[in-house]
Curated annotation (Swiss-Prot):
Organism: Chlamydia pneumoniae
Location in or out of the cell: Cytoplasm
Function: Catalyzes the attachment of threonine to tRNA(Thr) in a two-step reaction: L-threonine is first activated by ATP to form Thr-AMP and then transferred to the acceptor end of tRNA(Thr). Also edits incorrectly charged L-seryl-tRNA(Thr).
Catalytic, as annotated region: 237-528
Keyword set includes Transport: no
Entry EC no(s): 6.1.1.3
Protein name from the UniProt record: Threonine--tRNA ligase
């Protein structure tokens, strides 16, 4: 007999017992599709060992969802091979909200999608058992794929001592680490989404492939909800809205480096202005460091050896330089410009820095994935005893900032990786415990990601949920035990000795471009007044009303409002439609009655009309709406 643990209970089972056999002793075992054994995702068919700790997975768990989608990718490949036996499968990974599989020697169109889906349904109805098997060595594995140069390339690159596994379901088998579902019967709802061209290993010099994207769910209801979400996401696409609202553009001359238009800069400036106010009140000092720094700096920071492939480099006077991909090293140099005392700690230093990173052209996407962006970094220098309290301060800042935009979020604590880390065990334990206690005190829900911290320290990641329930990783709080030592930073302790400070590195927006993209989609282009690129548009009925309109425009601009005037010859109804299409918060129509009575006809972008509003009431209301950072209209 061996003893294992599940749900904090101990179980004695026979040697050779599988996770699936243990699951039969538990409630709702029919929902289990996989298992975490000692925190690693595994098949239900996995044999248990003495001391194992188990957590059974359903399709609602992140790890279970990944297993579900991974198996669905195999179903897609099996269906394609049944329909086009000469196709050559390559790889089929899980991606956000679905999966894809790449094929060589295949040509299909959208008209083939129903045929693929019908074939997948047949495979599901066959309830094929999914089995894992391993190869004794590389030669045995290579013999399994004699006609597939892609699989053989992958096999040859594996380390000599690495276990090589494959999975089979019916006539189909595929090289794969797994884990997978117990059978094909679980995939009740399957959808082919689109196809695209691809290259083997993303290299344009290699073989051309056809990529088929899909998604799947345990029920048709869940699939329908997901497809509705996709349609809603299309309506909210920040790239479409960014062009429609004249906020930003992408130019072929500079891929992945957005061009912000005047209207976009109004939103940008409002974001930065709010960020500065928030950080000034929280005791941060702002700096600005250079874009370009020499190789020596990047060697000290470790970027030259470990990150050079993602950096833009150049030579000046025979010396190597790089455009900064991160703000951190520049802040280290600022810290070293003078001596520091423990009395200054926590020393909070913030920077909105423009950084550049090499990204594959195929990975670029609007404002979400770019090569040039602004990062709102801050570095807090402190003593080990101050870590918990300062982390709590940062978490309160996070709550304030995201609450201002009406964004829900959750936090994830990533702990020490198993290998290739710096710092001794006691320091890691102290740092992780401090972050954990701060999270508990904050009262914000969080989950723990064992082993997913950075090599230089544990971290807290901020995941935002938008209006259509998508999640985005934005900000981060990282305890860095690496850079202060690399740059030989020091401070004077209370005892008069020199010591290396602890450093908390944090970003709240993360990439400001990306955060703006999230806001555009979350608000569907309908920005709250304080963020809006056009808060008020004055619409004249006739030319004789233009002088009064200009008078109001100039007066309101002096109050800090973003006001425009439409005195064109278009009809009033057309002017109103134009303003509504640009998501202007308030439209003011000026005619004879309004001028004679010194009142305003106000129309909201929701098409509510409020007549005979006094100028004083209108201004007082919208200035309150703007200054209070209200997310809803107050008029």
């Amino acid at each position: 007999m061996i003893q294992v643990t599940c749900d904090q209970k101990n179980y004695e089972v026979l040697e050779g017992t599988t996770a699936a056999e243990l699951a039969k002793q538990l409630k709702n075992s029919h929902q289990f599709i996989g298992v975490l054994i000692n925190e690693r995702p595994r098949d239900l068919s996995t044999h248990l060992n003495e001391g194992d700790t188990l957590v059974f997975l359903t399709s609602e768990d992140p790890e279970g969802r990944e297993i579900f989608l991974h198996t669905s990718a195999h179903l897609l490949a099996q269906a394609v091979l049944r329909l086009w036996p000469d196709a050559i499968p390559t790889i089929g990974p899980v991606i956000d909200h679905g999966f894809y599989y790449d094929f060589a020697n295949l040509s299909i169109s959208e008209s083939d999608f129903p045929l693929i889906e019908d074939t997948v349904k047949q495979i599901v109805d066959e309830k094929l058992a999914i089995s894992r098997f391993t190869y004794g060595d590389k030669q045995q594995a290579l013999a399994q794929f004699p006609q597939n140069p892609f699989k053989t390339e992958l096999i040859r690159e594996l380390p000599e001592n690495e276990e090589i596994s494959a999975y089979s379901q019916g006539e189909f088998f595929d090289l794969c680490r797994g884990p997978h579902l117990p059978s094909t019967a679980h995939v009740k709802a399957f959808k082919v989404l689109r196809t695209s061209a691809a290259y083997w290993r993303g290299d344009p010099s290699r073989e051309s492939l056809v990529r088929i994207y899909g998604t799947s769910f345990p029920t048709s209801k869940e699939l329908r909800a997901h497809l509705e979400q996709i349609e809603e996401a299309k309506k909210r696409d920040h790239r479409v809205l960014g062009a429609k609202l004249d906020l930003f553009s992408q130019q072929e001359s500079s891929p992945g480096m957005p061009f912000f238009h005047p209207r976009g800069m109004i939103v940008w400036d409002a974001l930065i202005r709010y960020w500065k106010q928030l950080h000034t009140a929280a005791g941060y000092k702002e700096i600005l460091t250079p874009q370009l720094m020499n190789r020596q700096l990047w060697e000290v920071s470790g970027h030259w050896d470990n990150y050079k492939a993602n950096m833009y480099t150049l030579q000046i006077d025979d010396e190597d330089y790089a455009i900064k991909p991160m703000n951190c090293p520049g802040c280290m140099l600022y810290y070293k410009t003078r001596l520091h005392s423990y009395k200054e700690f926590p020393l909070r230093v913030a920077e909105v820095g423009h950084v550049h990173r090499q990204e594959a052209s195929g990975a670029l996407s609007g404002l979400m994935r770019v090569r040039a962006f602004h990062q709102d970094d801050a570095h807090v220098f402190l003593t080990p005893e101050q870590v918990e309290e300062e982390t709590l301060n940062i978490l309160q800042l996070v709550s304030t900032l995201y609450g201002t935009f009406g964004l829900e979020y959750h936090l994830e604590l990533s702990t020490r990786p198993e290998k290739d880390t710096i710092g001794d065990d006691s320091l890691w334990e102290l740092a992780t415990d401090a972050l954990n206690r701060a999270l508990v005190q904050s009262g914000t829900p969080f989950i723990v990601r064992p082993g997913e911290g950075a090599f230089y320290g544990p971290k807290i990641d901020i995941h935002v949920k938008d209006a259509i329930q998508r999640t985005w990783q934005c900000g981060t709080i990282q305890l860095d035990m690496f850079l202060p030592e690399r740059f030989e930073l020091e401070y004077t302790t209370a005892q008069g000795t020199k010591s290396v400070p602890v450093m908390l590195h944090r970003a709240l927006f993360g990439s400001i471009e990306r955060f703006l993209g999230i806001l555009i989609e979350n608000f569907k282009g309908r920005f709250p007044l304080w963020l809006s690129p056009e808060q008020v548009r004055i619409i004249t009925v006739a030319d004789r009303h233009i002088p009064r309109a200009k008078e109001l425009e100039e007066a309101w601009k002096r109050l800090g409002l973003v006001v425009t005037l439409d005195d064109s010859s278009e009809s009033v109804s057309k002017k109103i439609r134009n303003a509504q299409n640009m998501q202007v918060n308030y439209m003011i129509t000026l005619g004879d009655h309004e001028i004679n009575e010194n009142v305003l006809a106000v129309r909201t972008r929701d098409n509510r009309v409020i007549n005979d509003v006094s100028v004083e009431r209108f201004l007082n209301t919208i200035l309150e709406e703007k200054n209070s950072l209200s997310l809803t209209a107050l008029l």
